[in-house]
From Swiss-Prot:
Its cofactor is Mg(2+). Pfam families: tRNA-synt_2 (PF00152), tRNA_anti-codon (PF01336). Its EC number is 6.1.1.6. This is Lysine--tRNA ligase. Mg(2+) 2 binds at residue 416. Mg(2+) 1 binds at residues 409, 416. Homodimer. PROSITE patterns: AA_TRNA_LIGASE_II. InterPro entries: Aa-tRNA-synt_II (IPR004364), aa-tRNA-synth_II (IPR006195), aa-tRNA-synth_II/BPL/LPL (IPR045864), Lys-tRNA-ligase_II (IPR002313), Lys-tRNA-ligase_II_N (IPR044136), Lys-tRNA-synth_II_C (IPR018149), NA-bd_OB-fold (IPR012340), NA-bd_OB_tRNA (IPR004365). One of its GO terms (biological process) is lysyl-tRNA aminoacylation. It catalyses: tRNA(Lys) + L-lysine + ATP = L-lysyl-tRNA(Lys) + AMP + diphosphate. It is found in: Cytoplasm. It is an enzyme of class 6 (ligase). The gene is lysS.
């Protein structure tokens, strides 16, 4: 039988089951409300397992504790059912009086149950169905328990079913929440202030990216979904908030990949009277403590292939290499003179098959060589520093070498996780760099920055020496949950319409 015929038969079977369930719902409507809202559980499944799972059977019998639980029926066989709530699963014992009720249920129905808590001879907790009520009639059948929801695209489209059917998916998103909460606690504990800045901006700034465009009808102006909150956060530092951070969405009208989604979550934070070295130290400490607190270990194991894995060690001091030195380190056939002039660097890039534009300077060519030959090889936690000024329009020039900036990017597993730098606080230098970005935009670079006159004006009031950083929350969660695609850590990733 062809796959197409199998799919058609499966759809026909599902339609039949849905019709049968709709008929049951009609019968329930005829005798009352099949969607009541008057049941209140006293316990969750996991809390019961934690509090009473180790107790002796006799002790539970003697206690005769009555509990109320609510959730979805995911198994219904004979004398026992399995109920799944937001915390986990627990068994239900079908008493003689409850057999008719149990028989009327379909997998996926949501019920409320009150009864005495017991332990079986095998050591499993269960709740007697002494009192019971249907709370929600499910009209669509759950995926087969042995195969789960296997279709990857369907999992992303119908995440609500994915969460019901696949416990590991639930675990990933619970862990994501804990990661974000740890970061908030860590920064709050260091006197950072959480703020919110505009998502709709008249001038998109803070990053080099193509924005989403919209129109504000009341003001009759074109606006953009923000690509980064950076320039607003630094305005707040000018205003006297010396440590600020924001965890929120950014939007970039660019391609989809396993590492990119047009809508994504970023942490950005700024600290006055600090430089990029201070933020590298902070990042190293934060990530080390994050792994230990959330995962219980500073060693994070990730899958590279079917039979290959790697362990990222967050306990050791993170490697620190400049862009220039990293190119030479990972390309031992190259010498310094091969990449220290526009002509020689272009020759190297050409040999690597890198397409180039005529207006690229040495710094841009070096970054292209770095991304082609180095980035994917940065497996253990590594800071890459001293990015060329040409590709760092908001970063402070290095005092000893103005060709580069006091900037770093942080990599693990060949993925960029963070980007930070000592902030450019020279208003005149910033204005000149904005003008250069505008020239590049006029030359056809859609990702080049706009000129932000108000931000330059803010700098003219004086931005104290400041360092700032952005960390991609989605990529960080991918790293710590060993997820292969960014879609695996987004509850509702973008998809084409069905």
């Amino acid at each position: 039988m062809s796959e197409q015929n199998q799919a058609a038969d499966a759809q026909q079977d599902e339609n039949k089951l849905i019709a049968e369930r709709r008929a049951k719902l009609a019968e329930l409507r005829a005798v009352g409300n099949p969607f009541p809202n008057d049941f209140r559980p006293t316990h969750h499944a996991d809390a019961l397992q934690q509090a009473h799972g180790s107790k002796e059977k006799a002790a539970l019998e003697e206690a005769a504790m009555v509990v109320s639980v609510a959730g979805r029926v995911i198994r219904n066989r004979g004398a026992f059912m399995v109920l799944q709530d937001g915390s986990g699963q627990i068994q239900l014992y079908v008493t003689k009086e409850a057999r008719g009720f149990a028989k009327s249920l379909d997998l996926g129905d949501i019920i409320g149950v009150s009864g005495v808590l017991h332990k079986s001879g095998k050591g499993d907790l269960y709740v007697n169905l002494d009192e019971y009520k249907l709370l929600t009639k499910a009209l669509r059948p759950l995926p087969d328990k042995y195969h789960g929801l296997a279709d990857q695209e369907l999992r992303y489209r119908q995440r609500y079913v994915d969460l019901i059917a696949n416990p590991e998916v639930r675990k990933t998103f619970l862990l994501r929440s804990r990661i974000v909460q740890f970061i908030r606690d860590y920064l709050n504990g260091r006197e950072f202030l959480e703020v919110e800045t505009p998502m709709l901006q008249a001038i998109p700034g803070g990053a080099t990216a193509r924005p989403f465009e919209t129109h504000h009808n009341a003001l009759d102006i074109d606006m953009y979904l923000r690509i980064a909150p950076e320039l607003y956060l630094k305005r707040l530092v000018v205003g006297g908030f010396e440590r600020v951070y924001e965890i929120n969405r950014n939007f970039r009208n660019e391609g989809l990949s396993t590492r990119h989604n047009p809508e994504f979550t970023m942490l950005e934070f700024y600290q006055a009277y600090a430089d990029y070295n201070d933020l590298m130290d902070l990042t190293e400490d934060m990530l080390r403590n994050l792994a230990q607190t959330v995962l219980g270990s500073t060693e994070v194991t990730a899958t590279l292939g079917e039979d290959e894995s790697v362990t990222y060690d967050f306990a050791k001091p993170f490697v620190r290499l400049s862009v220039f030195d990293s190119i030479l380190h990972f390309n031992p056939d190259l010498k310094a003179e091969d990449i220290d002039s526009p002509e020689s660097a272009r020759a190297v890039a050409k040999n690597l098959g890198i397409p180039m534009k005529d207006n690229w300077g040495l710094g841009k060519v070096q970054i292209e060589i770095f991304e082609k030959t180095v980035e994917h090889r940065l497996i253990q936690p590594t800071f890459i520093t001293e990015y060329p000024t040409e590709v760092s329009p908001l970063a402070r020039r290095n005092d000893d070498n103005p060709f580069v900036t006091d900037r770093f990017e942080f990599f693990v597993g060949g993925r960029e996780i963070a980007n930070g730098f000592s902030e450019l606080n020279d208003a005149e230098d910033q204005a000149d760099r904005f003008k250069q970005q505008v020239a590049e935009k006029n030359a056809g670079d859609d990702e080049a920055m706009h000129y932000d006159a108000d931000y330059v004006r803010a700098l003219e009031y004086g931005l104290p020496p400041t360092a700032g950083e952005g960390i991609g929350i989605d990529r960080l969660v991918m790293l710590l949950t060993d997820s292969a695609s960014i879609r695996d850590v987004l509850l509702f990733p973008h998809m084409r319409p069905e």
